[in-house]
Amino acid sequence: IPNLLAARLSANETAAIATLRNIISSQAQFQQGAKADTDNDGTGEYGGFVELSGGGAGRMAATLNPPVLSGAFRVLNAAGEVSRSGYFFRIFLPGAAGVGVGEPQAGYTAALINSDLVETTWCSYAWPVNYGQSGNRTFFTNQGGDVVATENSAYSGTATGPASDAAFKPADAGKITGSVAIGVVGVDGQTWKQVN
């Protein structure tokens, strides 16, 4: 039984990393195609799961068709999370002064985000639905394209994922526009290590 659990944990973690890499690609495609441009300056903005997956129009004039992310990301729980393969996923976009705003269950509105910062910044976390049973590591990525990981048993279950700034350097506490804590301690007190 321990070997089966270890195999399942490994498979779930591998799937979470692959999903984050898929989100990176989807965000790049969405932003470069200027699917959302709330300030009408001709520069595209990054999106939330509802927008990327075609689950709703969000900040766009119409629902994205075809979507750039799997339809499995159309339904968010009350905490703004999507559950996939033993992991919860959450997107944060920048609000005023670069503060991370988690995606609401119904998706983002223009009033929630900073229309200039969202042209250059987003981040996403993945953490176990049940630490030790569905996964051990928590993962992070953003527009830079790196995936980093840490192990923290507190990141387990719905509404108990990392704060928006958890994987950023302490000097950038409170914001998602700063430097990622790659190989060093982040705002959450954990060391975040790059995943290959």
Placement of each model-derived feature along the sequence:
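Amphipathic alpha-helical segments typified by the pilin-like N-terminal helix
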Residues: 1-33
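Active-site-surrounding "flap" and adjacent substrate/cofactor-binding loops of secreted or lumenal enzymes
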Residues: 155-159
